[in-house]
Amino acid sequence: MLKEGGIGLWELGHVGMASPGILSEDGEVILFAANLGFTGVRAAEELKKYFSCPVSLKNDADAAALGEHVYGAGKEYRSTVTITIGTGIGAGIVIDNQIMAGSFHSGGEIGHHIIVSGGR
């Protein structure tokens, strides 16, 4: 995409990546993304090998909600909820212009939750 847009790596100020699932508190590791088969993927660390700017990892529903809140249909409101259906079912929640990520960036995860070990 950068090449097609005529943008050099040195021109990037920040790189962002969104992933479904549960992320580490520091936003560096995809702890668990069942639908992708990921467990303990150090995604931000891997990206930092290729870019000389800061790298951020966000939950996909939170990233979608933030984009919709800032640039889309929610831009006129202080609080919004964005429901995502794709890599799972999730929600991004914005309250008073702040994303409410919750513990392990999973505050809006709606999809399948295991309640009993080995359960479905």
Residue ranges with predicted function:
Residues 20-23, 86-88:
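Short glycine-rich anion-binding loops that position phosphate/pyrophosphate groups of nucleotides
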